């Protein structure tokens, strides 16, 4: 008779944005800490956890399909994440799901796992988890989530109904995690949240402590402290508050990456008002001009929506004029699509699909030309590149201007003497509208 005890196995699916990925990492870290095995297939797992996305209709569909596949292959499924906030919608399609929780419900997920799968017998002195926790990104970069939820009520968005109002993590806790990641060899931290520039607003920017020293809970103080780690620090999801101006000098001094991901969404004052978004195009253009004077190497990424309800040709032309003037480096564009629960669905003058498509094409054609011209300016220059992949044909990396997965890449054809995580100096020899090619200096 064998005395080998069965080690419970958990299958895991993570869908959606980097913020959801961080939630998955936290759940997986807890599971591994308790001694559960995490396995890549469903058929030999004791149960499956599906961390869902519910931001847009296509994401909802993908999540429902993933749940269905897990039920078919395994039968015992726990659902969490943004779509979990809509339990009725999930139960209607998949009534056999065991349990459903909303986003960032880590303790509830673990309680459900304990209920349906026996807790492993685990020697607490045997560490199954690295100090930095389980990471789903390559070893040389990691996402650092600084807050949860959002206080804004943009009419096209349902995130606050899923993830709640802003809750900032204690700054000492955030900085301790950042230090653990840096000590583990992470070369780039990607700071994420629903609204990075609002960090600390909910706690009135109270003073926290890190290494026994007082630190204000604010985006600027956070950046100043992260700069001391000596690794790349990249800011994402930065709402255009006035105090964003205060981080530009830190970028100019090389303390954090000269990169700002700032979702502007539109340029027409009328459409911005319908979206419940702040600011005017003229004021934003003036700020961009000022930022570039302070930090000439600044890379600006933004996202926009075309075909928002009520958008006229005149409104759209304002957006194109803004693009021509702003000359942003990296731009994402989405055709407006109704999201269940979003107040924008009730607005008058919905734009026909063929008009959305036509405007999206015009937008992308213009921005691709601008992006190509911006990258062409880098030909002949030397830049730093963080290596992501290496094979027999060469290496692929990213410059300071490139976030993983959403931006471009730098191709080093024939360069095989490097490894992922290396930072190398490269001379740029060629560019298109998205990527660069170069050789190591």
Curated annotation (Swiss-Prot):
CDD domains for the chain: Radical_SAM
Domain Radical SAM core: 136-373
Enzyme class: transferase
Catalytically driven reaction(s): L-aspartate(89)-[ribosomal protein uS12]-hydrogen + (sulfur carrier)-SH + AH2 + 2 S-adenosyl-L-methionine = 3-methylsulfanyl-L-aspartate(89)-[ribosomal protein uS12]-hydrogen + (sulfur carrier)-H + 5'-deoxyadenosine + L-methionine + A + S-adenosyl-L-homocysteine + 2 H(+)
Record localization: Cytoplasm
Name of this protein: Ribosomal protein uS12 methylthiotransferase RimO
Entry's Gene Ontology BP terms: tRNA modification
Superkingdom as given in the UniProt entry: Bacteria
Domain MTTase N-terminal, first and last residues per copy: 8-118
Function: Catalyzes the methylthiolation of an aspartic acid residue of ribosomal protein uS12.
Cofactor comment text: Binds 2 [4Fe-4S] clusters. One cluster is coordinated with 3 cysteines and an exchangeable S-adenosyl-L-methionine.
UniProt keyword list: 4Fe-4S, Cytoplasm, Iron, Iron-sulfur, Metal-binding, S-adenosyl-L-methionine, Transferase
One cellular component (GO) term of this entry: cytosol
InterPro entries: Elp3/MiaA/NifB-like_rSAM (IPR006638), Methylthiotransferase (IPR005839), Methylthiotransferase_CS (IPR020612), Methylthiotransferase_N (IPR013848), Methylthiotransferase_N_sf (IPR038135), NA-bd_OB-fold (IPR012340), Ribosomal_uS12_MeSTrfase_RimO (IPR005840), rSAM (IPR007197)
Residues reported to bind [4Fe-4S] cluster 1: 17, 53, 82
Cofactor: [4Fe-4S] cluster
Domain called TRAM: residue spans: 376-441
Name of the coding gene: rimO
Species whose genome carries this gene: Klebsiella pneumoniae subsp. pneumoniae (strain ATCC 700721 / MGH 78578)
List of residues binding [4Fe-4S] cluster 2: 150, 154, 157
GO molecular function: 4 iron, 4 sulfur cluster binding; aspartic acid methylthiotransferase activity; metal ion binding; protein methylthiotransferase activity
